[in-house]
Swiss-Prot record:
Name assigned to this protein: Mammalian ependymin-related protein 1
Gene name tied to this protein: Epdr1
Stored SMART domains: EPEND
Free-text description of this protein's post-translational modifications in UniProt: N-glycosylated; the glycan contains mannose-6-phosphate moieties.
Bridged cysteine pairs (disulfide): C42-C172, C88-C222, C113-C210
Pfam families: Ependymin
Known function: Binds anionic lipids and gangliosides at acidic pH.
Tissue: Detected in brain, small intestine and in soleus, extensor digitorum longus and white gastrocnemius (at protein level). Detected in brain and skeletal muscle, and at lower leavels in heart.
Length: 224
């Protein structure tokens, strides 16, 4: 996702790959101190796999998913997780290939595939260099604490943020990412069980059924 001001959009493919489960907390690390002692944004890992829980105000639901994130090649794979029996709920796999400008949506049960253009540019899951440092604190209790830093796109003390990212201080892993619009949280994503690297790069290769993909996005519901 290209260099830009740290304002992230909550729509289109960006919202989709976070929605596939399922970037609004984010794990990040402690940056080096600046000339005035203020922490600087750290460099988040560019290739990792983990899990996420996405909350969207529009649906009022939490969506869980497995995530493979490849920032080097600008691609993301999201695999819906079933944690409860929800009547008429379809589970999907999402493969977003930003260099090719396309997203594949694959129904897990039937392998039915949809091929949808990506109209937004790549927006990496990281802390933009012009972000504002908000706070540093520990998550958890004694003997189980993890130090994190909180960043936002707030420009002055009198302005309000539209994006907040939380990253671990040690290795800059994403913990949470939050988007706000009109003083209301519209999307929030938590990241956990993060492991560095991509175990199987083939997860970014669409199945053969996508050779005859339909052009419209599939609904996650079903007809009764």
């Amino acid at each position: 996702m290209p260099a830009r001001a740290p304002r992230r959009l909550v729509q289109g493919p960006r919202g989709t790959w976070l929605l596939g489960s399922l970037w609004v907390w984010v794990l990040c690390g402690l940056g080096m101190a600046g000339s005035l002692g203020t922490p600087q944004p750290c460099q988040a890992p560019q290739q990792w796999e983990g899990r996420q829980v996405l909350y969207q105000q529009s649906s009022g639901h939490n969506n869980r998913a497995l995530v493979s994130y490849d920032g080097l090649n600008q691609r993301v794979r999201v695999l819906d997780e079933r944690k409860a029996l929800i009547p008429c709920k379809r589970l999907f796999e999402y493969i977003l290939l930003y260099k090719e400008g396309v997203m594949f949506q694959i129904e897990q049960a039937t392998k039915q595939c949809a091929k949808i253009p990506l109209v937004e540019s790549w927006d990496p899951l990281d802390i933009p260099q012009n972000s504002t440092f908000e706070d540093q604190y520990s998550i958890g209790g004694p003997q189980e604490q993890i130090l994190v830093q909180e960043w936002s796109d707030r420009r002055t003390a009198r302005s309000y943020e539209t994006w907040i990212g939380v990253y671990t201080a040690k290795d800059c892993y994403p913990v949470q990412e939050t988007f706000i619009r009109n003083y209301t949280v519209v999307m929030s994503t938590r990241f956990f069980d993060v492991q560095l690297g991509i175990k199987d790069p083939s997860v970014f290769t669409p199945p053969s059924t996508c050779q005859a993909a339909q052009p419209e996005k599939m609904s996650d519901g079903c007809s009764l």
